[in-house]
Amino acid sequence: MQDRFLKENTEIINLSSSIHPNRDSYLDSQSDPLNQNLYNIETENVKDLNIEDVDYYEKLQNFKIVDENIDPGLRTYSKRSVGVNNTFQNPCNRKIEGYIKEIERLSNSNKNLQAAVLQMAVSDTDDPRLKEEYKQTEKELLREISGNHKSKILKLEEELNDLKHSMKEMQLYMTKIIDKAMNNASLENLFSLDENNTKIHDK
């Protein structure tokens, strides 16, 4: 039984070797010297391809980027197919934005805390010079804090103004449509009145 199994597998191996011969043995077995010369030229020009040889942008575009160790919300895929224009997006953009917002929040909290400490220092000190210095520092902090809040308020006001402008344009557009519809209805009524008058006169 074992001899039969080995024989069958040996025949399969021999058959596959005859169908797909080894490249080197195939070229070496060719009697035509032209084939051998072409093979020598090809092997001389072959060199190892390093990762640095691939353009960085192409690497980003041609590979699917999925890191199983990061937050699933940050996972992104970059796919490139023929005829499709896909833009690579940095998977850490949202994380960085979150860090920036958190830094701003902590910075404002720190400034508020410093202002509170300065208020306590002003009330606790008896030295007029230190008291004036503390007050001045407190004013600068409060001015900076209010400036941050003002900038946010101004940004919200700009967005609100843009929204109002868009709503106004939409209202004007709707008014034009309604006016046009009313004019069409008035013309239809006018034509119907003319037809009725004509029928009355004919009688």
Curated annotation (Swiss-Prot):
Localization terms from the record: Cytoplasm
A cellular component annotation (GO) from this entry: cell division site
Coiled coil: 92-177
Superkingdom to which the source organism belongs: Eukaryota
UniProt record, GO biological process: meiotic cell cycle
Keywords, alphabetical: Coiled coil, Cytoplasm, Meiosis
Function statement: Has a role in meiosis and sporulation.
Protein name: Meiotically up-regulated protein PB17E12.09
Organism: Schizosaccharomyces pombe (strain 972 / ATCC 24843) (Fission yeast)
